[in-house]
């Protein structure tokens, strides 16, 4: 350069490239540039932190630089195993399509493939990535503990319910009245020969309800209240006995006078109840409470009832019978 300044003219010559950075210099300048370029190439330059420069002269404290995290080691790729599984699935799909076209027995499905890099959960047997497995296993552990506790509570409640249902009340003591020797003080109805006749049963069918007049007399007697009962005669008639005028004979021709019997002996009400009168007394009954069987066809005109709960015939208007 001194020679250039002295002469006052620019020397034109060949430019030589630098071996390190590749730039071209004159031979005189290249001798000075060579050691400087080599030193800067080997020396690592610190990264410039602009946040520190901006924080200078303010109250903001300088933040410590974060240390770079070491990169995790790369896992070896299992590309060969994945390739073989892919080929196996394609072959299985082709074989299934061929069997469906030709017809025949279906081949067994290919075995499931598992990624060896995944971690299996010991509670639900599912597989997850490392990061997901750390979160899932703790959650699944809590869920399994809750389910086991619920099972314990359910067994405890079952035991309590069984103990409640198996409870039996203490047996009542029976006290015999002083006037009787048998255990007649029980209030439960006992079977007897008397029966209650249901009025209006067709074709002489009579539905009898067992009742005991002796029990009713005994409950109304003074001996039921702890007072000695007087001598009861044997010729006492039961209160609910059937009058002889209402007793029907199956051999009599009742089938010809069904409509007349229903119209004379029953008084229908709009709510579906009926009143049967005999000997000056009224007896109320409900068809829903009767244990009889309802016919499917009308006994007057033979028309089939459209619904099971019909009370009257839709053609002739006659009330439905109770068998």
Curated annotation (Swiss-Prot):
Residues that bind Zn(2+) 2: 121, 124, 136, 140
Entry keyword set: Metal-binding, Phosphoprotein, Repeat, Zinc, Zinc-finger
Binding site for Zn(2+) 1: 18, 21, 33, 37
Cofactors: Zn(2+)
Molecular function terms, GO-annotated: zinc ion binding
InterPro entries referenced in this protein's UniProt entry, alphabetically: ZC2HC1A/B-like, Znf_C2HC_C3H
Family matches, as Pfam families: zf-C2HC_2
C2HC/C3H-type zinc-finger residues: 14-43, 117-146
Modification Phosphothreonine, positions: 242
Low complexity: compositionally biased ranges: 198-214
Region called Disordered, residue ranges: 42-81, 149-258
Entry-linked Gene3D superfamilies: Classic Zinc Finger (3.30.160.60)
Record-stated family: Belongs to the ZC2HC1 family.
Protein name: Zinc finger C2HC domain-containing protein 1A
